[in-house]
Amino acid sequence: MASDYTKGLSMKAAKLVFENLPSSYENGANDPHAREEMHNASCMAGMAFANAFLGLNHSMAHKLGAFHHLPHGIANAVILTRVMRYNAAEAPVKMGTFSQYPYPNALAAYAEMARYCGVEGKDDREVFENFCAKLEELKATIGIKGTIADYGVDEAYFLESLDEMVEQAFNDQCTGANPRYPLMSEIKELYLDAYYGREPQDYACLLYTSPSPRDR
């Protein structure tokens, strides 16, 4: 449900985060300007999603917090680029529930934000891949770990609670506003990929066909 109004806020917020989060994290009170800009970025991002709503990334993060007590920021960050790749598929099984556009456009929207943040590439797909790499670099800079398992989430309990987590994420209020409407089997694969650190997929037409959740 993004609009020209929310895009301006979200794009500026993202740029401020890239420019100021590393120093705010590293230097704290010794860099008050970076802290100020991060407060501004947080406020602008809130203004954007209060009007455009959120999506699957937040739905999945809500359940990681509820079931496994991951702080919400960490839960969002650890799955972020995987959900972005899922959303950026140009031939999804189902589109979003809100008819905002006649065809999938998440890839172009991600590329637009990426270019505003200084990311380059020969086409939208390359820009998007470079954007994901830039996000992973930022996450590493501030100590975000690579997988759900890295945060000490017990494997047996993760697998035991997975189906309930998937169902609750599917029914979360944020899911309906995602640009690509997910199947529960797709949410399950995203969780498993993020837990085990499996190689990212393009998620173009993802159905749950894995022989084992431990297949990495």
Which functions belong to the PLM regions below?
Residues 43, 47-56, 61-73:
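Glycine-rich phosphate/pyrophosphate-binding beta-alpha loops
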